[in-house]
From Swiss-Prot:
PANTHER family: UDP-3-O-ACYLGLUCOSAMINE N-ACYLTRANSFERASE, UDP-3-O-ACYLGLUCOSAMINE N-ACYLTRANSFERASE 1, MITOCHONDRIAL-RELATED. This is UDP-3-O-acylglucosamine N-acyltransferase. The active site is at H257 (proton acceptor). The keyword Aminoacyl-tRNA synthetase does not apply. InterPro entries: Hexapep, Hexapep_transf_CS, LpxD, Trimer_LpxA-like_sf, UDP_GlcNAc_AcTrfase_non-rep. GO terms for cellular component: membrane. SUPFAM superfamilies: Trimeric LpxA-like enzymes. Homotrimer. Its EC number is 2.3.1.191. Catalyzes the N-acylation of UDP-3-O-acylglucosamine using 3-hydroxyacyl-ACP as the acyl donor. Is involved in the biosynthesis of lipid A, a phosphorylated glycolipid that anchors the lipopolysaccharide to the outer membrane of the cell. Keywords: Acyltransferase, Lipid A biosynthesis, Lipid biosynthesis, Lipid metabolism, Repeat, Transferase. It comes from Rhizobium johnstonii (strain DSM 114642 / LMG 32736 / 3841).
Length: 354
């Protein structure tokens, strides 16, 4: 890749310094003073780059790799050619992620749309709003009456913070986001165009059509949650919609009213979660999954992409398909269906039907 003008390389660290930061072991101290500035995939890592490996499938790429360091666990160290410095880590993937954050700290947050260091003159801030020291408000942002913004938080250009909203410290609200009827903890990241706290989808059928049900709950977002671009999280109807600590939500996810999501979950793009569903801690949900309202998903569940979840799921299981079922059962069903389809497509004697 050519020089990236959006994220400039780090000024450089010695490998010994990087190893200490990562809690990794630099195998050969002769390389302690080698300077590294960036992270890169093994396929194109060059001098000054750090890469990592997770399996023996990387053997061929290592033979031609020119990286200044390879992060791996002890079981894979024998794969690395002698000309490449090795850093041993019990979790190479996490160590590589930490290295990336060290080299490119600005990339850990939404891109700033201005160089403002305080409050832009064009921002609209209600006089009753309370902003702690170090809050940055970019051009054309709007902050409503009695809102509270914690120290070190950045409010992006053209974003809207509604009345009485509370946002904790060291948060990043990207350009174009809107947050109403919500309470946010510390270290929360909201990406561009996300919509937090709007009406939930609630109607009662009546003789003259659909009667709107008032949505008078809130959205509660706990510490260190990250919410992707154009994701929508509805406020509760009578109760709250809650996103648990450390949960990461991808782009274009829809979360309905009263949904309860536990701690440290990962939810991939285009997932739809209907109202009042309860999701435990550490749940991983693949892309385009649909989850029925009022179901309960246990701790540690993993759900394959494009599944349709219509019933409760027991903790710790892997599930897939529509309707959602244990993953092995789903894969077996798919294999049988494909086998039958192939058989139907053949004439006696092995000739293909037209």
């Amino acid at each position: 890749m050519e020089q990236n003008v959006f994220f400039l390389p780090h000024e450089g660290l010695k490998l010994a310094e990087l190893a200490e930061f990562l809690g990794a072991e630099l195998v050969n101290s002769d390389y302690a003073d080698v300077i590294v500035r960036s992270v890169a995939p093994i396929s194109r890592a060059r001098a000054g780059d750090v890469c990592y490996i997770l399996s023996r499938r990387s053997r061929d790429e290592l033979a031609t790799c020119e990286a200044s360091a390879v992060i791996c666990d002890k079981a894979l160290a024998d794969l690395v050619p002698q000309h490449l410095p090795v850093m041993l880590s019990s979790n190479p993937h996490a160590a590589f992620a930490m290295a990336g954050g060290l080299f490119y700290p600005a990339a850990l947050r939404p891109v700033a749309f201005s160089g403002e260091s305080e409050i832009a003159p064009s921002a609209v801030i209600d006089p009753s709003a309370r902003l702690e020291k170090g809050v940055i408000v970019e051009p054309m942002a709007v902050i409503g009456a009695h809102a509270e913004i914690g120290e070190g938080t950045r409010i992006g250009a053209h974003s809207i913070i509604g009345p009485n909203v509370k946002i904790g410290r060291d948060c990043s609200i990207a350009a174009g986001a809107s947050i109403i009827c919500a309470l946010l903890g510390n270290g929360v990241i909201i990406h561009n165009g996300a919509r937090i706290g709007q009406d939930g989808f609630g109607y009662a059928p009546g003789p003259r059509g659909m009667i709107k049900i008032v949505q008078i709950g809130r959205v509660i977002i706990q510490d260190n949650v990250e919410i992707g671009a154009n994701t929508t999280i509805d406020r509760g109807a009578m109760d709250d919609t809650v996103i648990g600590e450390g949960t990461k939500i991808d782009n274009q996810v829809q979360i309905g009213h009263n949904v309860q999501i536990g701690r440290h979950c990962a939810i991939v793009a285009l997932v739809g979660i209907a109202g009042s569903a309860k999701i435990g801690n550490g749940v991983q949900i693949g892309g385009q999954v649909g989850i029925k309202g009022h179901v309960t998903i246990g701790d540690g569940v993993q759900i394959a992409a494009q599944s349709g979840i219509m019933t409760d799921l027991a903790a710790g299981g892997q599930y897939g398909g529509t309707p959602g079922r244990p993953l092995n059962d789903y894969l077996r069903d798919v294999a049988q269906q494909m086998s039958k389809t192939k058989l139907r497509g053949k004439k006696p004697g092995g000739e293909q039907n037209d």
